[in-house]
Curated annotation (Swiss-Prot):
The lineage of its organism: Bacteria, Pseudomonadati, Pseudomonadota, Gammaproteobacteria, Enterobacterales. SUPFAM superfamilies: AhpD-like (SSF69118). This is Uncharacterized protein YciW. The gene is yciW.
Length: 375
């Protein structure tokens, strides 16, 4: 598929090692931090265009502020600093390659005082950066060893919930911005050298009887604090309740996008889980899907088999192509993938909701992978 590729000097280098300098380092685009919309980052859209999406845009905007305060009090159980939060956000933004996002988080991060330049601090930041990059770009490789690396550098269970929520949120934000930019017909811009995300290995989906469990032991809370109104968060609610604000806002996001349910939503959820390597999310979706149960075996296979099936179904082909591009390479998602969806009697509002839903599915996939394991 032909893409417009524009390159220049708008690149970002994220240093993971602290150092002292005799001068202040400035972000490439310092004004990027000054936005009126902390979620869409001032993508130019009419109020009338955004009106149908306020039910999920409002909680997303609140999350964008809550997850990234300028100042933060650190405790023994909550050690993840404001600098580490924004550093993680920039790492994920770089993986996604959406320029607007990279400029914003670079400008937010640069003025903050970094950690001291001790070996321990450098090692901690390097481990956090590596984990964020892996969960954002190749989520299926995260395992108990990855979680142990975070524990070894002092991250608590609370910290691990926050870093996982941040990684999921930034991926969702990147894909939402990419969707609106494609709707507006903006030409794509991506960093040279960034690889497209691969499909997770099919072997992860071979066992249909797999179950999921949390990798963290947390204090048991009353059921009313840990139950979730959504199937996607039912198993995650107990561990995510360590940070109740983000859990509550994520539930609102899920419920508001579910209010715009389309038949394609199930296909999007299955495809995202398959690409990202979350058999737990795949099973949850398949349990609630009647239309796609008959192709369960096919969906568990590889990219070629899925594309061959989609090529035989014109409606699904456009959906599969769009979801694949947005999930695997949000920086390359453009009108070339958005426009074919309009040819199947869908409104732009329906299409945007579908694509935003797929970005939300990727967030849930990463939470399931990061915070637990299948057995």
């Amino acid at each position: 598929m032909e893409q417009r590729h524009i390159t220049g000097k708008s690149h970002w280098y994220h240093e993971t090692q602290s150092s002292t300098t005799e001068y202040d380092v400035l972000p490439l685009v310092p004004e990027a931090a000054k936005v009126s919309d902390p979620f869409l980052l001032d993508v130019i859209l009419e109020k009338e265009t955004l009106a149908p999406f306020l039910s999920w845009l409002d909680p997303a905007r609140v999350l964008a502020v809550d997850l990234f305060p300028d100042q933060l009090t650190v405790t023994r159980s909550q050690t993840f600093t404001a600098y580490e939060r924004l550093s993680t956000a920039l790492t994920v933004a770089q993986v996604c390659g959406v320029q607007r996002l990279c400029n914003y988080y670079s400008a937010r991060l640069t003025p903050l005082p970094g950690p001291d330049s001790t070996r321990e601090s450098n090692h901690r930041l390097a481990q956090i950066t590596q984990y964020a990059r892996q969960l954002a770009s190749s989520p299926s490789i995260i395992d108990n060893r990855s979680r142990q690396h975070l524990n070894d550098v002092g991250l608590t269970a609370w910290d691990c919930v926050i870093i996982s929520q941040i990684i999921g949120f930034i991926g969702f934000q990147a894909r939402t911005i990419a969707t609106f930019q494609a709707y507006l017909g903006h030409p794509v811009r991506w960093l040279p050298g960034l690889e497209i995300q691969n499909y997770a290995d099919a072997s992860l989906f071979a066992d249909e009887s797999l179950r999921w469990r949390s990798s963290y032991e947390v204090e048991k809370l009353p059921e009313e604090h840990t139950k979730s109104s959504t199937a996607e968060l039912c198993q995650l609610a107990e561990i995510l309740s360590l940070h109740p604000i983000s859990l509550s806002l994520l539930e609102k996001l899920l419920n508001s996008t579910r209010g715009n349910t389309q038949p394609d939503n199930q296909l999007a959820a299955l495809l995202c889980a398959r690409i990202n390597g979350s058999p737990a999310c795949f099973a949850t979706c398949m349990d609630s899907s009647n239309e796609y149960k008959k192709i369960s075996t096919l969906m568990r296979k590889g990219e070629n088999e899925i594309n061959q099936w989609a090529d035989r179904h014109s409606v699904e082909r456009a959906t599969v192509q769009a979801i694949q591009w947005l999930t695997r390479a949000p920086d390359r998602f453009s009108a070339a993938q958005f426009s074919p969806l309009l040819e199947h009697e869908k409104s732009s509002t329906q299409i945007i909701n579908l694509l935003v839903w797929s970005g939300l599915c990727g967030w849930i996939n990463r939470l399931k992978i990061a915070l637990g394991e299948t057995y």
